[in-house]
Amino acid sequence: MNKLENKVALVTSATRGIGLASAIKLAQNGAIVYMGVRRLEATQEICDKYKEEGLILKPVFFDAYNIDIYKEMIDTIIKNEGKIDILVNNFGTGRPEKDLDLVNGDEDTFFELFNYNVGSVYRLSKLIIPHMIENKGGSIVNISSVGGSIPDISRIGYGVSKSGVNNITKQIAIQYAKYGIRCNAVLPGLIATDAAMNSMPDEFRKSFLSHVPLNRIGNPEDIANSVLFFVPSEDSSYITGSILEVSGGYNLGTPQYAEFVGSKVVE
């Protein structure tokens, strides 16, 4: 028996990258997975492809920028399945061209990022938790970022918003543990998604990797495996409010780490 058999999951922003990898991973373990997306036709093609492998993936319309859509999406899933056992809040956005340091960054962009990155977690969790209470339990996994725990010289809005995701994870965990609901967060480092690879020059990636002890860029499967760990109750039944960095050790080294390794003192 698959560990997630008869479980119903929702993964937001699931057409590619971390969201798609997480949706597939949950489906491979027996879950009925709804993929919250804007591109229904393209996602249906993905679902049809994996249906041949016996996976149950279903597209459902989700636009994180349209607040009215949130309830419609949840109502659709509840109508179809009667419950939601698992929520993976994968949606997240950035505005690097306007989200700079405190003085030079755009103020409207700062609050926009907070509204969508934290607000999407808040709104979806607020809608789904009552159903989880009725179902006597559930698991929420929020996809945050190492940027939420490590300050940057730029992107203040993104960092603060992801820090907010980390905090709301703990708030949900402590407030709803008595109902059998667990909430944890996964904090990716540099992950080889199309969005990341297309926006980062080689020089930056090389510099970033010099601060990663495991000396490789992560892949969406690394994050999906962490999501899977947090979801089934038998694997992580005593874990809630956890903030797990999946970054190859990026937050372990001192600022001198790259220079230290480069000097070949460590071989």
UniProtKB/Swiss-Prot annotation:
Belongs to the short-chain dehydrogenases/reductases (SDR) family. The active site is at residue 158. Homotetramer. Keywords: Bile acid catabolism, Lipid degradation, Lipid metabolism, NADP, Oxidoreductase, Steroid metabolism. Induction: Up-regulated by bile acids, such as cholate and chenodeoxycholate. Maximally expressed during the early stationary phase of growth. The lineage of its organism: Bacteria, Bacillati, Bacillota, Clostridia, Peptostreptococcales. It comes from Paraclostridium sordellii (Clostridium sordellii). The record marks 145 as: Transition state stabilizer. This is 7alpha-hydroxysteroid dehydrogenase. GO terms for molecular function: oxidoreductase activity. GO terms for biological process: bile acid catabolic process; lipid catabolic process. Disulfide bonds: none annotated. It is an enzyme of class 1 (oxidoreductase).
